[in-house]
A protein has these predicted regions:
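Function-determining surface determinants
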Residues: 1-260
Length: 260
């Protein structure tokens, strides 16, 4: 494992505070004059290191498994448990975006992806009181977060490595995909979610960057993208609810992308 910088608890807290508002729509949103694209290898390496440290020090597998067992038994979580679950999932999502952004494969490792995805599906299920789905996702989560799988997941995070050249190409390609989506007359909910994931990972990048390098332009990019992310998130929550209630086919039915 390569040597990494170690950041203070204050820096970790600043990043997590930014993550917690990455879907909040500010009253006054201003897009920067231009999209920043000139990032040094040192900046990118520090961003990845911070994401790794946030996950490694901020996600306790024992706590996650305790919550999973409650999901299995009660098919739900109380308000305090939901908040703990939300915080763990937020750190999983942020590290997941880091795998996609910074590493050469631009993919989450399969086991990490499965855990993060199932956490989201379980949350959607218990929020919407779909007990059968809550139980099935809970059982799967219980299996893949047990030892030795939990050890593999930790090693994936520890061993994630930056590819600076690949980052820039992927970052630019993401930027090209957004107008392609928006030019479509209609998309499936799954395609809409794919577009939101692009926005979300760019939010995560600028959240991390502005934590390490406080800068008005980075802050504006983070908050502008967060506003879009938040509006899309509210719409996606409704689509997920309709899908769970069998009112729409998540992968086949078409929806219109809002103009505003």
């Amino acid at each position: 494992m390569s040597t990494r910088m170690h950041f203070s608890q204050q820096t970790l807290s600043l990043l997590f505070d930014a993550i917690l508002v990455d879907d909040i729509v500010d009253q006054h949103i201003e897009l920067p004059a231009y999209l920043p694209t000139n990032f040094s290898s040192e900046q990118l390496a520090e961003c990845l290191n911070l994401c790794q440290q946030l996950w490694l020090e901020g996600v306790a597998n024992t706590q996650l498994r305790c919550l999973i067992k409650k999901i299995i038994i009660h098919k739900n979580l109380n308000s305090e448990e939901r908040l703990s679950y939300k915080y763990i999932r937020a750190k999983y999502k942020h590290m997941g975006f880091a795998f996609i952004l910074y590493t050469a494969s631009h993919k989450r490792p399969l086991l990490f992806e499965a855990t993060s995805t199932l956490m989201g599906e379980a949350q959607d299920a218990f929020r919407n009181q779909v007990t059968s789905k809550t139980l099935s996702t809970g059982l799967l989560l219980n299996a893949i977060t047990a030892w030795p799988f939990s050890q593999f997941t930790q090693q994936y995070v520890q061993n994630a490595k930056l590819d600076p050249q690949s980052f820039m190409q992927h970052f630019k390609n993401d930027g090209k995909r957004i107008p392609e989506f928006l030019a479509s007359h209609s998309v499936t909910p799954a395609q809409f979610h794919a577009l939101r994931k692009i926005i979300s990972r760019h939010v995560s990048f600028f959240d991390t960057l502005r934590t390490l390098y406080p800068n008005e332009m980075y802050y504006k990019m983070s908050r502008f993208l967060s506003a879009i992310n938040g509006m899309m998130g509210s719409m996606h929550d409704e689509l997920v609810q309709k899908s769970l209630l069998k009112k729409i086919d998540y992968h086949k039915d078409k929806i219109s992308i809002p103009n505003e």
